[in-house]
């Protein structure tokens, strides 16, 4: 690949160099007389700042590389074919996610990216390096992750969140964002849940924020769609605005959460498929929990909610299943409401297609 160098420019700057082009809104891409070391110095993490010279097919996936593999590489003839000026291999060996240079702070969205990497390589024991945590904190102190209409757009932030949601340990991304004090900059509504108590009888984990991440973890274990995982993450936002005098109870938190979900979706420019499911799960999840006690009229209203397209109702029910089991000690609890409502939904679809609505009532 051609070595390149990205530098911060003034907003909307149009470079004169014919070999340059604008990147995002305030980056300029240079390709003239750029060395490979200069190129690598602009990469976000040291583990991504390794290049191989022509002659070595270096394609080992990070998650499959053991310390023994790296030691062999260090002691083999192939080491001479690697360009590793920032000790990326050493950081792989030490399981460290470390920024390559101060250039990391020129694109604050990298904060989300490194937490996404922490989620991806969580099972391999990777952690964010302390010096990188310090750099991130200095960036946040300068409010550099504030979402705006220039470089830090809602779309760019959500793109990283979307990628993070697809990881097997998606909850780790948000734990890391919370630990870095970065979550409040991108999703303050979610951050506000931490420290808010719930009734221990139903929520042994007590903390509303912890519960939300447990629900996301369950959604990942159930291999639910990204849209469903996003809905799982936001389903209890209303608990963050409960009157403190009413705690630990949260009567009406479903309705209270809907405008908060809408705020998140608007700020991050979330696609309709995500916002639609997140809104309905937030508003109606208690109805699914009480499915066996609902009357025909309420059930019909749920099934006939025209906001849900195709088979999104099934995703809705499955997120509620994740909610019921995303609680301390209840991870393997049965949830018959899911089978009950999915069977009703299938009957509903059949009755509507055959124009026999009474079959559902029966």
Over which residues does each language-model region extend?
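Catalytic cores of the polymerase beta-like nucleotidyltransferase superfamily
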Residues: 1-362
């Amino acid at each position: 690949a051609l070595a390149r160098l990205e530098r911060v420019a003034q907003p909307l700057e149009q470079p004169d160099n014919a070999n340059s082009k604008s990147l995002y809104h305030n980056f300029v891409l240079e390709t003239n007389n750029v060395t490979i070391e200069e190129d690598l110095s602009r990469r976000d993490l040291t583990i991504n700042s390794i290049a191989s010279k022509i002659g070595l097919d270096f394609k080992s996936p990070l998650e499959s590389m053991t310390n023994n593999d790296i030691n062999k590489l260090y002691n083999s003839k192939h080491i001479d074919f690697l360009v590793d000026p920032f000790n990326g291999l050493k950081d792989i060996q030490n399981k460290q996610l470390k920024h390559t240079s101060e250039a990391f702070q020129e694109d604050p969205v990298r904060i989300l990216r490194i937490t996404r990497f922490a989620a991806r390589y969580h099972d391999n024991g990777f952690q964010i390096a302390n010096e990188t945590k310090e750099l991130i904190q200095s960036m946040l102190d300068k409010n550099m992750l504030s979402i705006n209409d220039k470089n830090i757009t809602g779309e760019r932030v959500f793109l990283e969140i979307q990628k993070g949601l697809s990881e097997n340990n998606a909850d780790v991304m948000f734990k890391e964002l919370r630990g870095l004090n970065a979550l409040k900059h991108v999703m303050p509504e979610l951050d506000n849940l931490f420290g808010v108590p719930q009734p221990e009888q139903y929520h042994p984990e007590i903390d509303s924020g912890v519960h939300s991440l447990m629900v996301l973890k369950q959604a990942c274990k159930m291999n639910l769609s990204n849209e469903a995982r996003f809905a799982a993450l936001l389903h209890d936002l209303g608990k963050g605005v409960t009157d403190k005098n009413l705690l630990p109870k949260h009567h009406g938190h479903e309705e209270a959460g809907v405008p908060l979900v809408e705020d998140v979706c608007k700020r991050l420019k979330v696609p309709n498929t995500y916002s639609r499911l997140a809104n309905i799960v937030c508003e109606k999840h208690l109805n699914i929990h009480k499915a066996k006690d609902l009357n025909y009229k309420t059930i019909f209203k749920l099934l006939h909610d025209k906001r849900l397209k195709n088979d999104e109702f099934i995703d809705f029910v499955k997120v509620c299943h994740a909610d019921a089991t995303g609680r301390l000690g209840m991870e393997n609890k049965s949830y018959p409401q899911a089978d009950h409502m999915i069977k009703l939904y299938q009957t509903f679809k059949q009755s509507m297609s055959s124009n026999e609505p009474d079959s559902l009532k029966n």
